[in-house]
């Protein structure tokens, strides 16, 4: 059952990203490295205020939906009520999501799809190297230790 739940959680993650870039990859310019963002703004593909507004309009609902889904999966679907049980489940989900984001989203989808290539920036290096992915995912792995404690606390309080 946990594998099905992890798959659902990762598909929800993907769906949220896909919705954010409806109309083209430029709508998700905030996902790109700063140098690519700056160059896209110079080319007039988007302005910085619009990009920042789109980032905020994505990130706030994204975090709310992903947090709510995680709390409901752990507390309601799995019936976890103790902090410890909820913490370990949250840590598993967050770490799997972290790896999924780095490998499936960043390396496979972004790295092998023409969708993410911006007009006028065809030669811009926007796909992370394996070294960059490992560094970012290692840092996030530590952050998710604390994030799992927050989720565990919420589940314990609600359920």
Predicted regions and their residues:
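Juxtamembrane/disordered regions of integral membrane proteins
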Residues: 1-92, 96-159
């Amino acid at each position: 059952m946990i594998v099905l739940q992890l798959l659902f959680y990762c598909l929800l993650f993907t769906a949220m990203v896909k919705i954010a870039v409806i109309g083209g990859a430029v709508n998700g310019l905030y996902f790109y490295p700063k140098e690519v963002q700056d160059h896209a703004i110079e080319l007039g593909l988007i302005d910085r205020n619009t990009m920042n507004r789109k980032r905020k309009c994505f990130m706030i609902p994204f975090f709310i939906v992903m947090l709510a889904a995680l709390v409901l999966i752990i507390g309601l679907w799995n019936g976890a009520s103790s902090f410890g049980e909820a913490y370990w489940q949250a840590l598993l989900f967050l770490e799997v999501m972290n790896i999924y984001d780095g490998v499936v989203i960043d390396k496979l989808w972004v790295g092998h799809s023409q969708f993410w290539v911006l007009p006028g920036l065809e030669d811009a290096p926007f796909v992370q190297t394996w070294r960059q992915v490992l560094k970012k995912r290692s840092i996030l792995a530590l952050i998710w230790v604390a994030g799992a404690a927050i989720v565990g606390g919420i589940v314990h309080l609600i359920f």
